[in-house]
Amino acid sequence: MSMKILPAIDIKDGQAVRLFKGDFSQKTVVNPDVLEQARVFKEAGVTMIHVVDLEGALEGRAANRDLIAQIKAETGLAIQVGGGIRSLEQIEDYLAVGIDRVIIGSMAVKNPEFVEAALERFGSGKIVIGIDAKEGLVATEGWLETSNQDYISLALAMEKIGVRLFVYTDVDRDGTLTGPNIQHYQKLLASLKHAQVIASGGIQSADDLEEMKKLGLAGAIVGKAYYSGRISLEQIKEAERG
């Protein structure tokens, strides 16, 4: 099975940034021009990107919606978007401007009925559940809060109501370039019967991508490793082909 590799664009203050372990005070601007960054990916032959509205995650609204819609309109890239999704109207609006998949994060923990309603209205192909965990416990509200629910139990509960795709982020590894938490992915994949998993957090090299392919993951999100020059766009395409 081939693994899709999604370069990430995290948006804050209209710029493409990277955070360290999700800490907003430790942000690095990687490209002040978000559209230009998306074009770089497009020109390199990337087909899908992972876009996070960081203000949205903090404020619970689609703060960068217009910019994200513009990325879609100008590049035609497939886009999966997350950050601040709190209503069916927001999801509908994103899908209406051509966004391919919408990630529901905090609401999956706080309001499973919302996920059910989203699945019913938009279908499991458009809805992704983002599970962000700190030491195995699910983090919410832009990672500022940690719940007492572990990542496996949330994934199983979501799979039961019809979720078929997860993005799993190990917050402790995100933006650290220390390697992915392979054990967590193994446990998650072994627990799920129908759903697929996209990995995020800690990926530091093309070797990591090869190792993750062996696990049977549906995809992997590459952020800091690309922006810091450790993984090239050529290596990303090669890993997808291989």
Swiss-Prot record:
Q: Which domain of life is it from?
A: Bacteria
Top-level EC class as recorded in UniProt: isomerase
Question: CDD domains in the record, alphabetically?
Answer: HisA
User: InterPro entries attached here?
Assistant: Aldolase_TIM, His_biosynth, HisA_bact_arch, Isoase_HisA-like, Isoase_HisA-like_bact, RibuloseP-bd_barrel
Q: In which pathway does it act?
A: Amino-acid biosynthesis; L-histidine biosynthesis; L-histidine from 5-phospho-alpha-D-ribose 1-diphosphate: step 4/9
The active site of this protein is located at D10, D132
**Documented EC number(s):** 5.3.1.16
* Catalysed reaction equations from the record: 1-(5-phospho-beta-D-ribosyl)-5-[(5-phospho-beta-D-ribosylamino)methylideneamino]imidazole-4-carboxamide = 5-[(5-phospho-1-deoxy-D-ribulos-1-ylimino)methylamino]-1-(5-phospho-beta-D-ribosyl)imidazole-4-carboxamide
Drop me one GO molecular function for this one. 1-(5-phosphoribosyl)-5-[(5-phosphoribosylamino)methylideneamino]imidazole-4-carboxamide isomerase activity
Report if keyword Amino-acid biosynthesis is assigned: yes
Query: What Gene Ontology biological process does one annotation of this record name?
Result: L-histidine biosynthetic process
Of the GO CC terms on this record, one is: cytoplasm
Q: State its location(s).
A: Cytoplasm
The record's keywords, sorted A to Z, are: Amino-acid biosynthesis, Cytoplasm, Histidine biosynthesis, Isomerase
Q: Which family does it belong to?
A: Belongs to the HisA/HisF family.
What protein does this entry describe?
A: 1-(5-phosphoribosyl)-5-[(5-phosphoribosylamino)methylideneamino] imidazole-4-carboxamide isomerase
Species assigned in the record: Streptococcus sanguinis (strain SK36)
